[in-house]
């Protein structure tokens, strides 16, 4: 087992009142490998235009915007795909249609995982980021209010949170993507949290593996903890994730939550 904390900027605040968690890749591994569904599908759409571009170049472009928009609602990545198609002279397609097809393909990858959790063949621990469930409980017991915000559709987040066993741990609520909203849901959650809870930004700590929540938290003056879990092995650091999180402005990088005491000590909780 590998565990190390990389502190880029020491926390110097008076203590945390609220914690925001991302879901996929931060708490849940149900959707592990979603990029392996989205990126090839998006590349397939662009290649079908017959522009005779280099396939590696297309893959590089798609990977860049998929990574950059990780953490926002899925529809934003689909909007970026539509823009890439239109730039090449292709027809505009409702990004919602791209999203439907992506989710259909993703479901074939993750259906057995959800079924396994539903019928008890798999334990929630099998598909939770190491130590994450216990860590949330410890924060709650320390009097820190916990919120969950995800770019995944809200109905799916709530259901998958119940499968992992964390649905009832978020006294600040579970917030996911809604079809009617095209604003960044995580930005709204963070700003509402600061306003409604009357927080100084330094009283907010965010845990996430996406560019968006880390960048938003850092810009607003909260403390951003990048969770660079190697989702395939469940242990150690994913260097690509780490690089993305560092670029977003992470104050600290952890591989998972297994060593709760070490994380609490590093955060002065």
Give the role of each language-model region:
Residues 96-97, 167-183:
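A short, structured active-site edge motif that brings together acidic residues
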Residues 64-141:
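A metal-dependent, Asp-based hydrolase signature
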Residues 150, 206-252:
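Acidic, Mg2+-coordinating phosphoryl-transfer loop and its flanking beta/alpha structural elements
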Residues 175, 251-259:
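Short acidic-hydrophobic, aromatic-tinged amphipathic segments that line or gate anion-handling sites
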Residues 38, 123-127, 132-162, 175-177:
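Substrate-recognition element of Asp-dependent hydrolases with the DxDx(T/V) motif
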Residues 2-60:
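Active-site neighborhood of HAD-like aspartate-dependent phosphohydrolases
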